Amino acid sequence: MEHTYQYSWIIPFIPLPVPILLGVGLLLFPTATKNLRRMWTFLSIFLLSIVMIFSLYLSIQQIFLSCIHQNVWSWTINNEFSFEFGYFIDPLTSIMSILITTVGILVLIYSDNYMSHDQGYLRFFAYMGFFNTSMLGLVTSSNLIQVYFFWELVGMCSYLLIGFWFTRPIAANACQKAFVTNRVGDFGLLLGILGLYWITGSFEFQDLFEIFKNLILNNRVNLLFLTLCAFLLFVGPIAKSAQFPLHVWLPDAMEGPTPISALIHAATMVAAGIFLVARLLPLFIVIPSIMYIISLIGIITVLLGATLALAQKDIKRGLAYSTMSQLGYMMLALGMGSYRSALFHLITHAYSKALLFLGSGSIIHSMEAIVGYSPDKSQNMILMGGLTKHVPITKTAFLIGTLSLCGIPPLACFWSKDEILNDSLLFSPIFAIIACSTAGLTAFYMFRIYLLTFEGHLNTFFLNYSGKKSSSFYSLSLWGKEEEKKLNKNFGLVPLLTMNNTKRASFFCNKTYKISNNVRNQIFITVENFGLNTKTFYYPHESDNTILFPMLILLLFTLFIGAIGIPFNQEGIDFDILSKLFTPSINLLHKNSQNFVDWYEFLRNATFSVSIAFFGIFIAYCLYKPFYSSLLNLTLLNSFQKMNSKRIRWEKLINFVYNWSYNRGYIDAFFKTSLIESIRRLAKQTNFFDKRIIDGITNGVGITSFFVGEVTKYIGGSRISSYLFLYLSYVLIFLMILLFFYFEKF
């Protein structure tokens, strides 16, 4: 086994040959490299598979032997300072390596088909290989300097991949936004690292934790400065894991290709922040104020992400806010000291969210044949609906991922989220109420996404169907907002579900409208009627096998990965692999890690959390079941209809919810007004001061000297005697002034 650990340093560098060879090949042999492009995909998958097998072997060794291995090489710069670099293998490293490689392999297989028609196919796989290398280097780092180096590489790769289609202005702005926002966090992280080195004199994790703990226990350091350094360290993960208030880059990151969205949201960039907090938790845990700040940021992000996802129309953006909320759960768990629960949820959420993003990519892929290649249309859930019969495999996979994220047993996220909810009850009643309420919101907005996408009929079929200006709850249900302006009659993709008469379209109407059988039985969809073009397209179709295969594998992970953390405590049954891997683990809420929850308490807590999830699903089903469906709950709608006195107040609340979600909680607007506009005004004033004042002084001196010379030249008349006379006159005047001041002193 020791022999195996000696070669662990090679883990980050195994995927690296692909981007290097691709770069050299495209530079020296561009035609041959492009012709053999499928070979590069196979090589990328093969190399990442080697890393996965290696990581699995290390994890198995750690489960049975519970060992930590560190190997460090020292680079002496002078007698007083030496830089040490190496690798650190522990259970956290093994879990993250398995997560990165398994999700990465499936995303690479998926991308081979998804990006097959893109001109940047080889560039995409070069970026992906470098992304995997950077993330593997981050999780195997043995000190903070190495962490920061690979941390920056992860940020650079995300910048390149988010802006992969850089010719689109929206994508270019999105990658710049991600880059600038993460620079704020990275600057804080760098300051925190330097501050810790000033205090402890070491960058190594093992030495750092021991020295830090001794300084706290012996009261040999300024606690305020120590807290400041720890908080600055935490600023980096706030930005990288899209925590409030540095979360603003995450929704815009959806402008990159869908496989990148899956990788960023599941196993790489956003997971990097959670990983770093987990790695530094022995340091944070001795400062109670920092632990409370971590949990506070986490619970704010949990609620904010869920509320912002409520009325999103873009399927990828809705999933992005869902990721933000789930990352908040992980950060909350770490802030509560529940190390095991946080990492358990990181694992289960990664596979579930990767499944959902790859499923959304399959949906977008099928919709592009109908509405075109504009993300505003192909990703718009309002133009979807009725995809169940067209993409049944994608629908099944997406439904499993949705149910998992909702917390429905026995799927993956149920086990991990239930642990976090239970731990929040022990930590703070207020935090527990928010966390449980958000669990219901999660079920609501996830099933909203599912119902709008798969239930009913394909909404691009309908002509002259739209919610008009009215106090309509229904117009919010699908659109999220009532239209204030009149619709253009020539534009037919916007209208969705309006009536053919002059009556207002209301969600509270108890009349159903039957859809023409001619529409259902159409073989082709003519987009001519929608005012777009005269081409004819097919129905949505199921994706190819290379897209479906990764989704099915992720579906199996979503079904069974939760088993690694099921808390069995019966005699003769000990399947809790996760606790074995994290023995001894950090947990402030359960001091005795071997004392698992008994089945009665577990079932009681699980029943409560599942009830909340089912309540959210029920509300989503009632509000978002297709308006023309015979299964629509008209009794419920009539009960709302009778509450005429409260209806206006209720609709104002709904419009507020929509505006809050649509405007991203007004946080982007606040940053734009308070920061961006202020910086622009300051830049303009600085530019004015530089050009008019600074340059004016220097240019003024030059111009003055020029004119003085010209005047002197004119007076002198170009005669040497005149120049000599002027020179002597200047000297005489200078001497007179000097003598005047000299005699003035006496």
Swiss-Prot record:
Topology of this chain in the membrane: Multi-pass membrane protein
Reaction(s) catalysed (UniProt annotation): a plastoquinone + NADH + (n+1) H(+)(in) = a plastoquinol + NAD(+) + n H(+)(out); a plastoquinone + NADPH + (n+1) H(+)(in) = a plastoquinol + NADP(+) + n H(+)(out)
The keyword Disulfide bond appears for this protein: no
Pfam families noted in UniProt: Proton_antipo_C, Proton_antipo_M, Proton_antipo_N
GO cellular component, one term: chloroplast thylakoid membrane
Any one GO MF annotation of this record: quinone binding
Keyword field: Chloroplast, Membrane, NAD, NADP, Plastid, Plastoquinone, Quinone, Thylakoid, Translocase, Transmembrane, Transmembrane helix, Transport
Main location: plastid
Transmembrane segments: 9-29, 40-60, 89-109, 125-145, 147-167, 185-205, 221-241, 258-278, 280-300, 327-347, 354-374, 396-416, 425-445, 547-567, 608-628, 723-743
Compartment(s) of residence: Plastid, Chloroplast thylakoid membrane
GO BP annotations listed: ATP synthesis coupled electron transport; electron transport coupled proton transport
Class of this enzyme: translocase
EC number: 7.1.1.-
Protein role: NDH shuttles electrons from NAD(P)H:plastoquinone, via FMN and iron-sulfur (Fe-S) centers, to quinones in the photosynthetic chain and possibly in a chloroplast respiratory chain. The immediate electron acceptor for the enzyme in this species is believed to be plastoquinone. Couples the redox reaction to proton translocation, and thus conserves the redox energy in a proton gradient.
Assembly with partners or alone: NDH is composed of at least 16 different subunits, 5 of which are encoded in the nucleus.
Listed NCBIfam families: NDH_I_L, PRK06590.1
Stated family: Belongs to the complex I subunit 5 family.
Protein name as catalogued: NAD(P)H-quinone oxidoreductase subunit 5, chloroplastic
Organism whose genome encodes this protein: Olimarabidopsis pumila
Source organism phylogeny: Eukaryota, Viridiplantae, Streptophyta, Embryophyta, Tracheophyta
